[in-house]
Amino acid sequence: LNLAHGLMTQAVRADVGDKAKCSVTLNLQFNRGDADACHRLDLISNRAFLDPMLRGRYPDELFSITKGICDWDFIQSGDLELIHQPIDVLGINYYSTNRVAMSDRPQFPQSTEASTAPGASDVDWLPTEGPHTDMGWNIDPDGLHDLLVRVHDNYPEVDLVVTENGMACKDQLTVNEDGTKSVHDPDRIDYLKRHFAAAKRAIDEGVPLTGYFVWSLLDNFEWYFGYAKRFGITYVDYATQERIPKDSFMWYRDFLASRKG
């Protein structure tokens, strides 16, 4: 992934020139709880990508905590220079936070099975406090603020964009007496209000947040859950493909209109 990013950035700049605006989007984690566990996961889930892309090197600690499953001998001469291409903006996907703690399991040997956090077999994921979205993810607007501030503190040279943020709800389609259709989703509106406020606090504290994309415009196919989870601010009747704007759509429209100028 890191090499592909470097090759893509080189190719775009070679083809488009100075007009090119290059970026990368990462699913960054923000964890709460035990400091050692949070640091371990930050190395594996965040800095394994951010450091080579933005600093031109992998963290030394990353090598030590993954030595039981990987010797990193695949890194070839010139790879880091290729990965470390200048970008104009860093995209961040954010939905929720995790609560973690170090376990009493030994770090090594570690399983070589597929994992979202290789090198963290001695970290426990703990239950999070509610409320939760329909995905089971906790709602933590402060986590967005804290993540934006931390990324800016560590990598101050790059502008930031929130490329995904939103929630899945158990949306119900209502057919009104006059035949019109509506979807009332007050929880989603509250979610967006609170996350927008958290992002605004980060901006006020100096974070160069230049964009924000709500996930998502339409209900869509989720990789793991298919059509069972609805993130859109527009309801999709999958049988007819009809699109019905939800209450959150109207709220978001009015919010954007109020911000013009």
Show the residue positions of the predicted features:
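Active-site region of glycoside hydrolase catalytic domains
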Residues: 1-261
